[in-house]
């Protein structure tokens, strides 16, 4: 792990203004859909706990114009998804966002939608794309040119190691690629570049045999083969998991390609809970600890696709310590939307990062 720390962290800042068109949404959500359509940051769906122990899913579609200079965002609710949804995936392509799968209180989803804006009315236009071969939620999604990938997650209600792909605009059915090696991965992150797919994070809940991986996987689309990628490490040298984190491919104006990652759970604390061990805290008290106890990842991490090495360009920052956030990219600037600060507590914050 290289640590090329910049002297000051003005590159990371919190913006004010969060959507509030539905009762409870203003408390912040996690696992929403978000991305840019032109100059508009679009946020849709997500979930939270407006009342303790009662998860609520949302259907609103919100838009805020972003110039890059503002410190606050002004939101307008411009429409609704066909039903409340969260824990799906989203990619940006041209003047549209593609929303993939997800779930709500009633069921998990097979649906794949594209959304773009009516330039005159400012309202969202939804189009239905080929549905998934099974319901999928809590997966990773990414785009390689025009091929959409869905990695792991819960498929038909079961943790999966499946890899699915669809050529947008050309194919009517999804392709089943070679499975991820070893265990299923729920809540992984992924990105794709020049014929290769990169995956980190995810978890497999299986009692004392539960797994929360730190190392990643690379899938070569030509040879259909898998290789192992190094784990990210924090400034103290400890391996990190990117379970519940975000990942985004960023290509600089000079052509340098990096996968930028932030957030995610603490491996040891999360494993202790999903395995049912509860050696760190009594099960009844797991949701009652202070935010700092959960030790969500507060490092901004970049994986250089040329060197194959991880880097930490900024000091640790508590603004990034969240799980289940969504990330949107405009130019080389990233906007992190919502997420949870600890299990059950969402953030209404939007964090702007300029690498």
Describe every region a protein language model picked out:
Residues 1-355:
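Kelch-like beta-propeller repeat domains
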């Amino acid at each position: 792990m290289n640590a090329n720390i910049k002297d000051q962290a003005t590159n990371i800042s919190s913006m004010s203004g969060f959507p509030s068109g539905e009762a409870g949404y203003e408390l912040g959500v996690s696992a929403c859909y978000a991305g840019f359509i032109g100059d508009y940051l679009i946020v849709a769906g997500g979930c939270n706990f407006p009342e303790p122990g009662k998860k609520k899913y949302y259907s609103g579609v919100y838009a805020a114009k972003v110039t890059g200079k503002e410190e606050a965002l002004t939101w307008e609710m411009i429409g609704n998804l066909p039903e409340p949804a969260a824990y799906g995936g989203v990619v940006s392509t041209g003047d549209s966002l593609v929303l993939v799968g997800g779930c709500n209180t009633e069921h998990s989803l097979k649906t794949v939608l594209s959304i773009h804006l009516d330039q005159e009315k400012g309202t969202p236009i939804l189009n239905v794309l080929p549905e998934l071969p099974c319901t999928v939620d809590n997966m990773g999604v990414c785009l390689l040119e025009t091929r959409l990938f869905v990695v792991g997650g819960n498929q038909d209600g079961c943790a999966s190691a499946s890899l699915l792909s669809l050529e947008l605009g050309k194919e009517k059915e999804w392709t089943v690629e070679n499975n991820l090696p070893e265990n299923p991965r729920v809540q992984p992150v992924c990105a794709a570049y020049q014929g290769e797919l990169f995956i980190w994070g995810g978890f497999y809940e299986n009692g004392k045999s539960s797994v929360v991986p730190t190392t990643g996987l690379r899938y070569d689309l030509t040879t259909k083969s898998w290789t192992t990628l190094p784990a990210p490490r924090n400034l103290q040298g400890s391996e990190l998991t990117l379970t519940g984190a975000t990942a985004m491919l960023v290509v600089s104006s000079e052509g340098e390609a990096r996968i930028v990652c932030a957030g995610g759970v603490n491996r040891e604390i999360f494993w202790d809970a999903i395995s049912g061990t509860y050696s760190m805290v009594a099960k009844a008290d797991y949701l009652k600890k202070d935010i700092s106890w959960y030790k969500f990842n507060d490092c901004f991490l970049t994986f250089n696709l040329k060197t194959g090495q991880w880097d930490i360009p900024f000091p640790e920052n508590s603004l990034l310590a969240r799980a289940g956030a969504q990330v949107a990219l405009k130019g080389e600037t990233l906007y992190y939307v919502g997420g949870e600060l600890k299990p059950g507590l969402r953030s209404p914050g939007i964090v702007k990062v300029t690498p």
